[in-house]
């Protein structure tokens, strides 16, 4: 909502000032971004020319404030993991709980989940993650700084010791692989009855150069149990990363350098999902870049109690986005 408010303010400013742009400027406010992206999907399906563009700006990255209150870096989201849910279903004979049977749907499901919980994908560097590690290294202290540099520079297999340092941070470890985790369970209808089936929802965040079909095939191999059915609940589809170079990144780098000297622009791969994935799939170079400076402490409040944006950040955000639009208009 805050990014939308800043965008509206900038559009109003451009209109009132009589600014003449050489290129079309489109404002698309879409619903359902948090729970599926139905809004942008409908536009792309029913009226794609309404959002036809070369560069799209969305939330997802942004300006990070240091402890001194100054912008220390700018995260530029150029790609994101594919959100995809799978469902595991195990079946078993029903009956009265006073006569336990060896074949039990809940036990079958529990065995499958235990296999999944003990498995971890081998680490590998997606190009966006490599660029992110290289940029973030300068912002960290040792030993993490050196470990990030070593991984970013590794031409082949990732060196073991630096990898261990980076993987000790769960948020960084998740960028090195496709992840799948159990998030919901259901099974049984009465305490005194053996369940006919038990189900688990598995949420996967898939690296953008993989597909949900590949993730499902890997789940099948991990579980290695034909009695446990794996079905797809949501078609996330492929979501290729946006180019690391081009009009969008160049304009953002120029504006950041002019307003916040010394703050690097670092490409990031988002672990979460946004509407940008649908734009990228449609061939639009979409970039996550919130113009509002925010501290790491406040960013952790997102979707939680006391979620907030400083009023000063709103004022800065208007200037950042205004400059960015004018800069993009020159490309």
Residue ranges and their predicted role:
Residues 1-75:
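Acidic/histidine-rich catalytic neighborhood of metal-dependent amide-processing enzymes
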Residues 62-72, 76-79, 83-317, 322, ...:
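Metal-dependent amide/peptide-bond hydrolase catalytic core
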């Amino acid at each position: 909502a805050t990014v939308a408010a800043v965008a509206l303010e900038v559009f109003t400013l451009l209109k009132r000032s009589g600014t003449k742009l050489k290129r079309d400027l489109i404002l698309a406010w879409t619903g359902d971004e948090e729970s599926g992206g139905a809004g942008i999907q409908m536009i792309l399906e029913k009226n794609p020319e309404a959002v036809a563009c070369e560069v799209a700006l969305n939330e997802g990255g942004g300006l990070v404030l240091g402890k001194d209150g100054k912008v220390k870096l700018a995260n530029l989201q150029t790609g994101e993991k594919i959100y995809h849910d799978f469902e595991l279903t195990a079946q078993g004979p029903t009956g009265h709980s006073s006569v336990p049977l060896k074949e039990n749907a809940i036990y079958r499901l529990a065995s499958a989940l235990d296999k999944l919980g003990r498995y971890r994908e081998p680490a590998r560097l997606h190009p966006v993650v490599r660029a992110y590690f290289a940029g973030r290294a300068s912002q960290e202290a040792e030993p993490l700084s050196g470990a990030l540099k070593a991984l970013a520079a590794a031409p082949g297999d990732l060196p073991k010791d630096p990898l261990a340092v980076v993987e000790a941070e769960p948020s960084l470890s998740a960028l090195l692989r496709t992840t799948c985790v159990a998030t919901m369970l259901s099974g049984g209808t009465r305490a005194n009855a053996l369940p006919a089936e038990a189900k688990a929802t598995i949420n996967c965040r898939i690296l953008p150069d993989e597909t949900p079909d590949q993730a499902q095939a890997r789940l099948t191999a991990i579980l290695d149990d034909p009695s446990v059915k794996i079905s797809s609940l949501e078609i996330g589809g492929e979501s290729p990363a946006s180019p690391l170079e081009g009009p969008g990144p160049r304009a953002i780098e120029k504006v950041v350098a002019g307003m916040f000297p010394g703050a690097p622009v670092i490409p990031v791969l988002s672990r979460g999902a946004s509407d940008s994935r649908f734009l990228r799939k449609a061939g639009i170079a979409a970039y996550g870049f919130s113009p509002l400076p925010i501290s790491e402490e406040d960013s952790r409040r997102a979707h939680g109690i006391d979620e907030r944006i400083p009023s000063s950040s709103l004022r800065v955000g208007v200037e950042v986005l205004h400059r960015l639009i004018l800069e993009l208009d020159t490309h």
